[in-house]
């Protein structure tokens, strides 16, 4: 695509046609900033790129929509992206402190309570996090380093809406 505006239009059009193929359509928008200009890329663009890079390593098969500029832009490899994200399952051991460090390193912001994608909160043995690949945040309860429960919750009421056996946390940048 020529730019991010046409990229979004192509994504909407192609999304209609790829829905019946069983393949996901991933989007890798360009930064649209000159690396030497000193200006930072838009945060939403960074989030969308990080999510697509994460999903490329998680789901198969898929289509990838990108611009020529995105194609030539250097990016981190699949192992580095996987290291920034996390897959969490009940009864697995994960150090809550290590998860908090990983969240901060991958672009999440600590807020209490969380209200938006890309935020996390820690209270005792409870970690709330809202990953960009989910529609609602999850609450992960630990007993020591062992994951005791994973629940989807409503950010407005803070009430649990669904129990999960596992969840993934995609990087934000």
What are the language-model segments listed below?
Residues 1-173:
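ASCE RecA-like P-loop NTPase motor cores
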